[in-house]
């Protein structure tokens, strides 16, 4: 949700909390821009799983929710997998493998990079790349909702997917 607010340059579009796990349902945002390839599209905020402080019963419902959502969307242009810069979890690896198994090659965005020291950044990006078994040419986008770092690269990735759709 923080990333969506940052990406769209809006403070309170998506609800954000200090405690991870605020997003507990599929939230749909209709976006309009002046870009001819991205004139109107939807951004979907799905529940995260990593550090969410929610009951196990709630967390157990997220897998089927994500699965049914992602499997039922033929018009889906781009999947963005957010990975916390502090650690790549087993769930991150499983999600990446599952996305590949259903035909999606997600853009991986490493969040909270503003918390990393300069010497940790390169190592963290390499670890994410290796931990998720990413192909050599696939980039990892470092992102900070606080500073806006990575915003232009992520917009570029979304636009690239829209341009390919239009060809």
Positions of predicted regions on the chain:
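Conserved G1/Walker A P-loop phosphate-binding module
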Residues: 1-53, 163-165
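Extended hydrophobic secondary-structure segments that form protein cores and membrane-embedded regions
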Residues: 43-45, 80-81, 141-144
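Conserved nucleotide-binding/hydrolysis micro-motifs of P-loop NTPases
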Residues: 22, 48-50, 85-88, 113-117, ...
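Canonical P-loop GTPase G-domain recognition
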Residues: 115-167
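Long, positively charged low-complexity segments
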Residues: 57-59
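Residue-level signal for inorganic ion chemistry
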Residues: 29, 111, 154
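Hydrophobic aliphatic residues
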Residues: 7-11, 70, 132, 158
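Conserved C-terminal guanine-recognition region of P-loop GTPase G domains, centered on the G4
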Residues: 38, 61-138
